[in-house]
Amino acid sequence: MTPVVGQGEITMVVRGSNPQRGDIIAFYYNNKVLIKRVIGLPGEWVNIDGSGNVYINGELLDEPYITDRALGDCSITLPYQVPDGRYFVLGDHRSTSRDSRSTLVGPVSEEQIMGRVTLRIWPLNRIGFLQ
């Protein structure tokens, strides 16, 4: 999930916290661990316009962490209501991210979530808290 977490970087995951919008989470998908940002919470409506702007329940979501505001591949029908017990996640590099916009990944269940990614510990020149 670039630009926040790059390939080969090592991060710390805090287990046991309920994900909130904007949190970066690690979750299991197809015997792999993916890192994405929580966008939609259970029961919310998520919509993405042709310019890549994200709306939650009709309100434009402020995403200062995004540099690549693109729709990317989207195989779900928008607007999309997040099912109970699941979270809608997007990668920060929207044009290439495999995330909840894909029916292959879909919304992430609470059981899939390892925890919140809070700290990058490798490489040493990029050590620090993630936002």
Locate predicted features:
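Soluble "head" domains of membrane/secretory-pathway proteins
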Residues: T2-Q131
